[in-house]
């Protein structure tokens, strides 16, 4: 492994941490409806647990209602049950072939809990990014010890990895501020 490889690996891993945070934040419910709420709902499809998005079309009907239209008519009841059992606090209602999923408005107390959850997710992401920095720095020290790079190269690479870390931590903070604003908007 070279110094460039260590930096590239750290960058890729930090980017994955950001993507994971974005996915986790998408699951946090806000006052508005969004299709991401149902992304992890699993439906029993011919005996196999299948992602809801693979057995139904999920759309937004309005700001507070999600529409779910199963591809097969006989799946309507199964999909409705899966949404109800997904422990999301949602109560779907069937209208013919369409399942309407109204999202209830969040109480002030629940909004504050959601903000705490968002901050917790962000802190986990920051910890992951810092751990990646630590691993990269250890790799650089090992390269220096093995005389695969000079002290100057190692020092420069550590500085660049620190800049990367700062950049990604700043991105985490930005994502959190956006999500907090979204959660607290009534």
Curated annotation (Swiss-Prot):
Gene3D superfamilies registered for this protein in UniProt: 3.30.1360.40, Ribosome-recycling factor
MF GO annotations: ribosomal large subunit binding
GO CC annotation: cytosol
Entry-linked SUPFAM superfamilies: Ribosome recycling factor, RRF (SSF55194)
Similarity remark: Belongs to the RRF family.
Function (record text): Responsible for the release of ribosomes from messenger RNA at the termination of protein biosynthesis. May increase the efficiency of translation by recycling ribosomes from one round of translation to another.
The protein's name: Ribosome-recycling factor
The gene coding this protein: frr
């Amino acid at each position: 492994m070279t110094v460039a490889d260590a930096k590239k690996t750290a960058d890729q891993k930090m980017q994955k941490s950001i993507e994971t945070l974005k996915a986790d934040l998408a699951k946090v419910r806000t006052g508005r409806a969004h299709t991401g709420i149902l992304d992890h709902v699993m439906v029993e499809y011919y005996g196999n647990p299948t992602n809801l998005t693979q057995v139904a079309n999920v759309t937004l009907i309005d700001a507070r209602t999600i529409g779910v239209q199963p591809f097969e008519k006989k799946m309507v009841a199964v999909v409705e049950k899966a949404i109800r059992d997904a422990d999301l606090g949602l109560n779907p209602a069937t209208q013919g072939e369409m399942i309407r999923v109204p999202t209830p408005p969040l109480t002030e107390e629940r909004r504050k809990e959601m903000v705490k959850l968002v901050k917790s997710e962000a802190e986990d992401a920051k910890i992951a990014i810092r751990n990646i920095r630590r691993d990269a720095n250890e790799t650089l020290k090992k390269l220096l010890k093995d005389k695969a790079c000079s002290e100057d190269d190692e020092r420069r690479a550590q500085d660049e990895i620190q800049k990367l870390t700062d950049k990604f931590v700043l991105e985490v903070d930005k994502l959190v501020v956006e999500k907090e604003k979204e959660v607290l908007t009534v």
